[in-house]
Amino acid sequence: MKIGIVCYPTYGGSGVVATELGIALAEAGNEVHFISYDQPFRLDLFSEKIYYHEVAVADYPLFEFTPYELNLTSKLVDVVLHEKLNILHVHYAIPHASAAVNAKHILATHGINIPIITTLHGTDITLLGKDKSFKPVIEYAINMSDIVTDNDKVKPKKTHTVERV
């Protein structure tokens, strides 16, 4: 299976969990493609089953803030199309799950239905979920994911609200 994993490349828990999961999946014979703005710090690329795709984050004079989520969405579309990925596993509701959902809609115009697994790591709900400006995006990203996991528990596909997750 060809699996895309989207995570933060930093020392935090979500990046560690995503990287270790990807390494284990590669050791089990899967082809794993990490997609992030930097190589995850625990990722060893000396495996013929592990690939890294960097999300280019360019500064544009028009934007006060770099639109990382849009760059990530475009990169996800590109990697799924060119690497023929079977599934996307994203860690964190925003910007990763929301970018994956947008990519899924774009890929549908190419006749591709890519399943999305979203793993929540707590702070994306407890911290970001408290900010009402993020709530509709978080709920949408979670609800549009095919599978939602949280601390190694799989949640059935149903409508989630930030308060219930």
Regions found by a protein language model. Give the residues of each.
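Alpha-helix capping/helix-boundary segments
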Residues: 40, 95-96, 154-156
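Nucleotide-sugar donor phosphate/pyrophosphate-binding loop at the beta->alpha transition
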Residues: 107-117, 123-144, 149
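An amphipathic, basic-hydrophobic alpha-helix
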Residues: 62-87, 97-98, 102, 132-136, ...
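Extreme N-terminal starter segment of soluble prokaryotic enzymes
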Residues: 1-4
